[in-house]
């Protein structure tokens, strides 16, 4: 979770979600409930996203490779998180495409 110029309203809500997840993890962990905070920092390659790009004059197939995330890759990350052993739970996971510029 990163704050950035021009994104104060967005960032404050995202930081609030992170705090909520931290509190829930501490509260529910003793009951063997794994709470994790995930950040999906990219567009997801769905027909909805592709249509919005076309409306903006962008042809999705012309985007650089790995710009949009494959929904199956996101699902696998969630699945792997779900199957973690309690002695090695992940609390926070950032999922982003290789092509993202830092």
Label for each model-derived stretch:
Residues 6-9, 14, 47, 67-68, ...:
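Residue-level preference for alpha-helix termini and adjacent loops
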């Amino acid at each position: 979770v990163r704050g950035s110029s021009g994104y104060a309203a967005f960032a404050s809500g995202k930081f609030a979600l992170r705090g909520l997840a931290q509190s829930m993890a501490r509260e529910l962990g003793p009951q063997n409930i794994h709470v994790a905070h995930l950040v999906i920092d990219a567009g997801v390659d769905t027909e909805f996203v592709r249509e919005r790009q076309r409306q903006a004059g962008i042809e999705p197939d012309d985007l650089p490779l790995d710009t949009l995330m494959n929904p199956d890759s996101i699902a696998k990350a969630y699945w792997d998180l779900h199957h973690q052993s309690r002695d090695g739970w992940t609390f926070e996971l950032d999922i982003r495409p290789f092509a993202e510029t830092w």
